[in-house]
Regions:
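Long, compositionally biased stretches
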Residues: 371-440
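Cofactor-pocket helix-loop regions in the catalytic cores of large enzyme subunits
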Residues: 1-160, 165, 169, 189-387, ...
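Glycine-rich, small/polar surface segments that engage phosphate groups of diverse ligands
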Residues: 173-174
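Surface-exposed loop and adjacent secondary-structure segments within mature catalytic domains
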Residues: 178-183
Length: 440
């Protein structure tokens, strides 16, 4: 595990059923081992079999060392995924550009430990390389995320029991995302889109940089980007520079204080809830609906109702045609009073992989009413093989060496191998790493 603190996050996205410590302890009872790679002795470190300190930002180098050893020892074995992989032959030459001795030096992890961990991981009956926030918000984070999955693939642990597996949610939302990559780029620094979205990190530059396409208005739903994003002061300046900012949020906080208008929705206990996001990260297949606990006051609207009305207003403002205005108004009335969030959830459940459809005699199939009748949720089975059917690539294969990551390796090498890291340290006014190794 790299850069994850289960004791604090309770496992975050892998916490189905909570009690992460119990799950980690059960791994040991089965003869397994839990290894944590983290530059800080976190609250979770004391529960690990091993904790290795690592130089901040050097996670990619550590993973390259592991992969290099696995290939050198002849331990690379993709298992049943072998016929569903492209780019296998590229990986070994790519990692062999780096010297293992230098990797040990820049990561702070002994060469003998790197070799041992690589051999133990590749030789285990099942294993998984997993990382979270700590490796996602640092320099070379993209490379680190890629290399972790390379580790899982080359050791035969991708989509295998005991390895990296994927749930089958009761409402399949992934097919709706129309996943895409680099079909267009951002205006200022040319960042590629992913699934129709840009990273939040570029919002400030898109607001502050003049020119055609400059962001001048913002509609925000929840979140507190001044605190949650890096360089909050720059975000404050950007928000203050907007011509108009609408916040849909129940709170006046560090971000919404810049809004021209705040539209507060009803509270979370005043509306029903079905989780669409976290079911994508479950460690079992299950489904649960939480009904509202309190009646919504007539003056309060849900987020869905607020956005439904806003969309209707936008649509009518964008046309001068009276017939179109009338049509948009009729659609709005239909959606507002007929297509409620509960009905959307019910349709998703009924026509999902476990759904009852419109068959009234299908007693086993899922529907919203069935979830309401089982308030603690319904177990839908353990995780099962989902690849290659679950792949969204055109050829139904995993591209093990995407060009965007391959092209970024020279930057990694320049930083850690060709003296870039030492140059940065000598030019910096700071001579300390703000990382504590103190025991909690």
């Amino acid at each position: 595990m790299l850069g994850t603190n289960h004791k604090v996050s309770n496992g975050a996205q892998m916490s189905t059923g909570a009690n992460t410590y119990k799950k980690l302890n059960e791994i040991r009872q089965r003869g397994g081992k839990c290894i944590l790679i983290d530059p800080r002795r976190t609250e979770s470190a004391k529960y690990m079999d091993e904790h290795h300190f690592i130089t901040p930002h050097a996670d990619s180098m550590f993973l390259i060392g592991l992969i290099q050893v696995i290939f050198a020892k002849g331990l690379a074995k993709p298992g049943r995924m072998a016929e569903h992989i492209n780019g296998w032959s590229q990986i070994e030459p790519l990692v062999n550009q780096f010297d293992l001795g230098r990797i040990a030096e820049v990561t702070g992890i002994a060469r003998s430990d790197i070799e041992r961990i690589a051999e133990e991981f590749a030789s285990a009956n099942s294993a998984v390389c997993y990382g979270r926030t700590g490796v996602s918000m640092v320099q070379f984070a993209g490379l680190t995320q890629w290399l972790m999955q390379v580790m899982n693939v080359i050791t035969g642990n991708m989509d295998e029991i005991g390895g990296m597996m994927f749930p089958k949610p009761a409402i399949e939302s992934l097919p709706l995302t129309q996943s895409s990559w680099d079909t267009y780029r951002s205006r200022v620094t040319g960042r590629p889109e992913f699934s129709g979205e840009f990273p939040m990190a570029i919002l400030g530059e898109e607001i502050m940089t003049p020119g055609e396409g400059q962001v001048r208005g913002l509609l925000g739903l929840a979140g507190n980007m001044v605190l949650s994003m890096a360089d909050g002061h720059h975000t404050e300046k950007a928000l203050n520079a907007l011509e108009f900012y609408v916040a849909v949020d129940p709170y006046l906080n560090e971000t919404t204080r810049f809004a021209d208008v705040i539209l507060p929705p009803c509270g979370p206990l005043e509306k029903g809830h079905y989780d669409m996001f976290y079911h994508l990260y479950d460690t079992i297949n299950w489904s649960k609906y939480s009904p509202q606990l309190f009646e919504t006051q007539s003056s309060k609207w849900t987020d869905f109702e607020i956005f439904t009305d806003l969309m209707a207003c936008f649509a009518r403002k964008r046309t001068a045609n009276p017939l179109k205005k009338l049509f948009y108004g009729a659609i709005h009335t239909l959606v507002r009073h007929t297509l409620t969030t509960d009905r959307i959830v019910d349709l998703g459940l009924r026509f999902g992989p476990y759904g009852k459809g419109i068959n009234p005699f299908n007693k086993k199939g899922l529907s919203l009413q069935k979830l309401k009748d089982n308030p603690h949720g319904i177990f839908l089975g353990n995780l099962e093989y989902s690849l290659p059917e679950g792949l969204y690539t055109a050829d139904k294969k995993i591209n093990l060496a995407p060009q965007c990551f391959v092209d970024d390796l020279p930057r990694l090498k320049a930083h850690f191998v060709d003296g870039g890291m030492e140059a940065e340290q000598s030019e910096s006014e700071f001579d300390m790493k703000i990382i504590s190794r103190l025991t909690n």
